[in-house]
């Protein structure tokens, strides 16, 4: 299929720049994936679509405050570092600006010297392997010195960094939030659980590749970025049992779908305890083996994520739903409203 086939017109003012005061006060568009019927609801109405014996699968990754501002020791030049992926030990793959100032062997100091870095290797496109030195626990140092790496389409400063974390975020490692989960509060999850819905967690660390535009004309030629995922034995067994008993598996976010479908596609539709790196690209024509329904935000035109949701329903129904969202002034992208495709 052509990437252009997934384009739609989006007025810039519909791109949500800040989160709503109350996580659950967002709107919810409900789309019947077979008929294309649309209902405009509130996010708290999601409870009425979840039944006893269903599974609600959430991604418990935690966003790192991965943007650091430091000084090049040799010259005093200001350097911005974005952590991308942990390598061996204290070495990280990073994106450095301006990259030309940091060559192999260069050193950078952050804060008052609580964190230092040495460049071990130069990569293309501004990438650098940096080895960090510090006292104490790295993630605690990062919490003190780092900033949240907000998506490029968000221009406003984030007043409360916790609003770019889900309330159940636990596993450090993401460069971006699994944004469908931002709508949930502990109270809403408790009400869902009290209805007999099983709350199950997976982990997928979201990479910055999630914001990278698709730069090919044909979707068949697109290569996905890789992201780390993990499913525990307990979670795998619980989901398998629910499927056998006829319950629905409802994924919260495209990251949860990518985790479950990566594993199910390798094991004849079964889920097993597994961790690794996935480059799964889900687009129309894909047959889902693990997931029945999806809670997700509204995605960018021509993105791999709008291709994924089109695979769960179909392209024409999704684009019709997106056009409806524009007409009804839904809020788009990371801090925007939600959609339930079932």
Curated annotation (Swiss-Prot):
Annotated family: Belongs to the QueA family.
GO cellular component terms, A-Z: cytoplasm
Recorded name of the encoding gene: queA
Subunit and partners: Monomer.
The protein's name in its UniProt record: S-adenosylmethionine:tRNA ribosyltransferase-isomerase
This protein's pathway: tRNA modification; tRNA-queuosine biosynthesis
Localisation: Cytoplasm
Record keywords, A-Z: Cytoplasm, Queuosine biosynthesis, S-adenosyl-L-methionine, Transferase
Domain of life: Bacteria
SS bonds (residue pairs): none
The enzyme's E.C. designation: 2.4.99.17
